[in-house]
């Protein structure tokens, strides 16, 4: 394959500078002329004798071009009536040089072992004798495309290595030469390329074609070898006009004939050489099958054509030496050796879909493979190099970062690194052994060669890297030592064998000495030998071992003198043995100077054996040693790493390992000692801190299955080594290890919501393990055979397992003590092997699929009932095949598609409709062996398949995909593949676990293949369907029984909310790093408390027929940035509240609500024409990228939906001409993207080197924009060339004299000025033309988060809440005259209630609207010096909403300590009571019977235990009392308003007089659990048998409800009933219990309704008269809030999943509503039941109940 610098193609003439004639040669008549056809310069070579007139590359025959591209493209034209010759010298893999010649001089094909001669005829006349001869008079320019790999493979049975030289001989014109690994099609246009799976010729290589003409009418394309199958024994006869180019194949051998095509070809693909069967006469017997056949026939089965063209088949596998496939590296290719089974991707398949590559190897979990002795320090001691099966890993020990060397297709058996970290040598284990030399710094493979040894066991570099020695076995099993010269490899040369030697002595270790590169040492059974390379001969001499001659030596190491003396006399050799001996050998005298033996001796009571250095008896088996100038590190089979002084007087340090130590290596600085164990552990001991650091752990046998847990980012693997291991995906470190000595684990899966995983074993047992306690929780043994499949539903309520005996088990996992529900025999195919894809659950949890009851059938069942819904006979799918097909693995696609994918034994993946069983499409030729695992991404874009030792990725979304991308790296078959929960990574497991990054961004407007058209929504819905919603969870067709199918829902959410599993990126949810930066830099999303099931199954219905309609939104997202826009000229005013864009008429107060975002909106931008509004939200759990919605302002419809960044969008801005939209990612994403507003396609994107806090277009020049960040201003210049836009960057640092710190805001002033705000409160002024800061002044004490300029005035807003107006008209003059802050003065100042985050002003900056972090929007008038509240909301969580008796007002309380009274009609703030430094936790409004309206009062409970009474009419606090020692949780008035009941978090209920402030009764019945609800009503039911005027209840967090009858005027209180509900052991609501809520039924005084964290998610209806539960209403989740409508039989329930459910208790139906961005913790009907208030954190939504 072509090296990276030769990819995708190489211009040979340009690279070797032919015009200079320094690296090339010319002879005879060679000149540069201008060709009229090509309209450019070409080289003319002419002369009567071809051999005397030529161009040769390279100049000298002793040099080599070293071009490894598979295809050579020769662009030439023969001179009329002349002969021409083209000679190519090609080197094979075994370094044999073969000349390949093409000429019209040759009359027939000739072949020798070193020369191939092909006749090339460019005109065909009728007589055969005229076929060979002179070029025609009208010879045309020709593209000669030679497949050098096929030429050598077919005709000489050799494997192509590289192109060594080229000679172009007279007479011809030549334009250029190119090499490439890609098969280009020269005559394909752009339109044809879009429809055909071919790669067009690059523009640089293409011939010019005038408009309206055909390429084939002007030029000739010759492809050799061709796709032709048969070649006649005589020359081909053609009579064609215009002339054809014909390459004549060999006469006597009917091998494939080269074909030249000068007519359009319907399907032009890569050349395919097909070797006919050996039985055919005249076939080349020695030619192996070079390439498998590729069929691009248009014939398709009816099933494949049902829904569009099928996938093009991939060719079968073959035993190849070279193949063009993807590796794990980003876009690189590798040359695999001949014994590797690797897929031969059809040329062009690498270009099949973009990005290419779509996967990039990020991390590897594993160590060793062939052995665990290969682990090295880099010379600088910063990294460790070790093999992980076929991958070489370089691990930075301080950061844990990995990089990889990829290309080996079998386990790496030996490694060596030179002393300068320049060259890395590696060898792979499978015979015959292939070796590679790598550039260690770049990771590029410099050389690949076959070792003379059959198996390489050890490698050693000289310190300079010029000599490499290897030890191994030849094919007879004899020990062999080889020395290679590697000095010329880095200069383009090759590895040279310097010497070879066979020896009968055993060699276990071999080292080149550091003091002399010609000397080496080896040790083995009974021998220690010193070697020398001299005169091309390796000779060795034994060391006299004396009495130690029978020892089994295992390792050796040289000790360098402390003074660094390089003399041999200064070096000593240490050798260790399996008997515990360590010999110190003088290399100069070749004698043993000291012999020591390490023996274990046990002291009384000692925990470990002590060591003594010399004695008799059994010693400690030493496997490895390493020596530094000060100490010797010894690794032994008893699991200890010991550090000794060089005199071995005593142990300095020791570290015990979990297994025998197999290798030790002291770092170059001597401070760290690397150790590896045979149990797969790799780590190092820090000698200074005496701390052992684990670097890598590994399974010691192939991994069978894996599973991922989303919340903690953990991975579980099971292996043939009988262990179950839990890994941290972020660090790739092992967290837990569960081992079973008798029972082998087979399958594993995580519980979706709890810290638990399930594992199936070979005995048939299924066990659950706790990740918190690291122990087995429950075990079930309902299977008789080994467990073959294990999977759970997405909600975690059900678990399924299958076994090798064919049984299927269903478990209930609603509680930790999970139990068996059903066991069905003979369901699953009994002889199916264990596979991660043996069982599959649909992503909505409703369907279960598996292979069974026979191999030929796939069964689909209802997951809850196990009712059989579908059975598909796979064996009857392919009627054209005589072989009975069988199913191997199954997986479901996204719920929206309804696809079920089945891999079969006939190398296909069949896509079925999961409901009807209809064949939707088919992917043929996936892999010749069974596929054990396959999975489809959440957005249905990529299909991942385990294909032998490779991973294949298909573009599933494209019906006519040309083929997959193939990735190597595994040395054993891949057992499992899976996408990570966020879809941004892929895991593959086999010999090791590989973690791959998915490089493809989420496509914004991509729809599911075959997905049904979107349902039309209500008035608030736009024409664009939410791609993110379709990419994850689609609305359920049914809600849980007994509710009917959910009718269409209201327009509060114009699209299905993308809550998905509710996981959110909360990295920015904490407090900002510094106070002033909170309002200056980034959008900080509100703390999200949504559960992982957020909005799953909700569907936004239209307004018609809905039960609720969103009327108003109370609040403003003060944590956004620039999330308010106002245009005074049009009156357009919009701001954000949670996920909603609120468009409000400032005159009437009427609101429109634009919905569809799946997360909280961070920022807004209005186009300069005021016709388009862009809104951006953060990333939700269902979308890997954030959303930007583009709205039509006039219609309120979403016109475009794009997904620009993987993190939150920090800023948006339209260009002055509204042709571009710039988006800026936050400090994690740091991406700047430009979008064309015509189609909103991505125009340009760049990764920023550091966090940026703001971006703005130059209003005077649409081609310039500016970013500000950490101490720099970045100017971007936009250069447009056609449709492409490139960015030129210029960075200017902030002058040190300014001392501004971080730049946090910016705005353009009068040309050419730019104003920048800083985190320290300064404003800097820049000259954008000169790129310098010429003025700064201190504008505030806090960070400047906002700047606006118009005319000659500048507005600044800071984190201190100050809004200041500056006169800056004189600043332009200061640019030339010099700076002076005295020329800038402040005109006005206003202090607002929070940090300024958004602002819009009119052109004169006289009035504007300003938003603050307090959730307030202010109208500011500079002329009047006033600020007026426009929008006011709570800045923190709203705890309660209550209503006045006449329903004219409502009141809210919040954790910010405020009680606010609102006018209900306009939702304008009327009164606010504020208590500093306290949280107001509960609130109650006095009932209507307490007196006249002017005597209405509010009772508010606070966190300090106080209860305050406020007078609404007098707007004053009347009374403060302290009835509780701890925080109040709920408060209520009695029906007459003369008594207040309050509950606290300790479970006490206090009864107080609001007039006197006395507490006259305290009830402690609920003590120990917080009181969550107190509900008071008039006692209407006389059947209760108790006295009293009031009936009230108290509910506490321990699932208990007490019901009381009271008459407080008589001081009477009597218990009516006591209810206790079962308490679950754990909960599904984020680790804390949902509240226990109860309320009296307003339409039936005898009924009580209760919700809480019970065993089941339901509403319990209890009859107080009958003393029993009369009804239960199921819920999808645990309730967080509850409210009953006084006027109708409606029940409102809020959930932590950001969802609201309205239940009609009379009809038994329900509707779900979305719109909140957080848990709906509060819902309250107004007394008239006409309105419903819901609250999520600090946002309040007001809903109208139509029909009342």
UniProtKB/Swiss-Prot annotation:
Entry coiled-coil feature ranges: none
Region of interest (Disordered), residue spans: 274-308, 1004-1071
Gene Ontology cellular component list: centriolar satellite; centriole; centrosome; ciliary basal body; cytoplasm; microtubule; plasma membrane
One GO biological process term: cilium assembly
Region (Binds with microtubules): 1-207
Keyword Cell membrane listed: no
WD repeats: 407-450, 452-494, 501-541, 615-654, 656-695, 698-737, 740-779, 782-821, 882-922, 926-964, 969-1009, 1156-1201, 1204-1245, 1247-1286, 1298-1326, 1327-1376, 1433-1472, 1475-1520, 1523-1562, 1568-1614, 1715-1748
GO molecular function: microtubule binding
Pfam families registered for this protein in UniProt: Beta-prop_WDR90_POC16_2nd, CFA20_dom, WD40, WDR90_beta-prop_4th
Keywords: Cilium biogenesis/degradation, Cytoplasm, Cytoskeleton, Microtubule, Phosphoprotein, Repeat, WD repeat
Source organism superkingdom: Eukaryota
InterPro entries: Beta-prop_WDR90_POC16_2nd, CFA20_dom, Quinoprotein_ADH-like_sf, WD40/YVTN_repeat-like_dom_sf, WD40_repeat_CS, WD40_repeat_dom_sf, WD40_rpt, WD_repeat_EMAP
Modified residues (Phosphoserine): 241
Subcellular location: Cytoplasm, Cytoskeleton, Microtubule organizing center, Centrosome, Centriole; Cytoplasm, Cytoskeleton, Microtubule organizing center, Centrosome, Centriolar satellite
Function in brief: Microtubule-binding protein that plays a crucial role in ensuring inner core protein localization within the centriole core, as well as in maintaining the microtubule wall integrity and the overall centriole roundness and stability. Required for efficient primary cilium formation.
Family to which the UniProt record says this protein belongs: Belongs to the WD repeat WDR90/POC16 family.
Protein name: WD repeat-containing protein 90
Native species: Homo sapiens
